[in-house]
Amino acid sequence: MSIQVFCDFDGTITNNDNIMSIMEKFAPPEAEEVKNRILSQELSIQEGVSQLFQLIPTNLHDQIIQFLIETAEIRNGFHEFIQFVNENNISFYVISGGMDFFVYPLLQGLIPKEQIYCNETDFSNEYITVNWPHPCDRLCQNHCGLCKSSLIRKLSDTNDFHIVIGDSITDLQAAKQADKVFARDFLITKCEENHISYTPFETFHDVQTELKHLLEVKL
């Protein structure tokens, strides 16, 4: 049995949700209604996020990148946590509902690209189009966009010990099949609603301390 860590990006690795930051800065007012319909699960994540990015003109690409480089903050303890998982030969994957044009630059030098799974964007037309290279498999019908539970099934064996780290509704399906969940913010609410056991965290120091204890118990 191996331990595998599947970690969200927006609002988890970063302190802020970068998609929401983009929408607040660059999207028209109607983005707020779409966002609320995603959070209430009236819209699927795939439908909602597609609609949000269709509100953003592609000629803002460089401004968006510069804005995120200046405002995105990596959560406290993440650098040390990555060093810890590498030293202990723990498999680590970023499974992000975020977009390639900002996830890759913000993680450059921290996580190898082949360990990052995110959505793709097309800037060739007037408005941003989102492509979905990691859709739901036959076991998930939630139209997740990037399906985290499907990726977990694809990247691991059933006898592996699965750890999910996340903060929002987009992490719920993955949390349902995890052996251990680290949750913060809205994911805590959803875990409690769905009777999913979780450990709250605010920094990756919290996660590392708990994971170190878990390794000692497992060994």
Swiss-Prot record:
Name of the protein described by the UniProt record: 2-hydroxy-3-keto-5-methylthiopentenyl-1-phosphate phosphatase
Gene3D superfamilies listed in its UniProt record: 3.90.1470.20, HAD superfamily/HAD-like
Keyword entries, A-Z: Amino-acid biosynthesis, Hydrolase, Methionine biosynthesis
Top-level taxon of the source organism: Bacteria
Pfam families: HAD
Pathways involved: Amino-acid biosynthesis; L-methionine biosynthesis via salvage pathway; L-methionine from S-methyl-5-thio-alpha-D-ribose 1-phosphate: step 4/6
Enzyme kind, highest EC tier: hydrolase
Chain's role: Dephosphorylates 2-hydroxy-3-keto-5-methylthiopentenyl-1-phosphate (HK-MTPenyl-1-P) yielding 1,2-dihydroxy-3-keto-5-methylthiopentene (DHK-MTPene).
Lineage: Bacteria, Bacillati, Bacillota, Bacilli, Bacillales
Homology family: Belongs to the HAD-like hydrolase superfamily. MtnX family.
Gene source species: Bacillus cereus (strain 03BB102)
Reactions catalysed according to its record: 2-hydroxy-5-methylsulfanyl-3-oxopent-1-enyl phosphate + H2O = 1,2-dihydroxy-5-(methylsulfanyl)pent-1-en-3-one + phosphate
Gene Ontology molecular function: 2-hydroxy-3-keto-5-methylthiopentenyl-1-phosphate phosphatase activity
Keyword Glycosyltransferase in annotation: no
SUPFAM superfamilies the record matches: HAD-like
GO biological process, one term: L-methionine salvage from methylthioadenosine
Enzyme Commission designation: 3.1.3.87
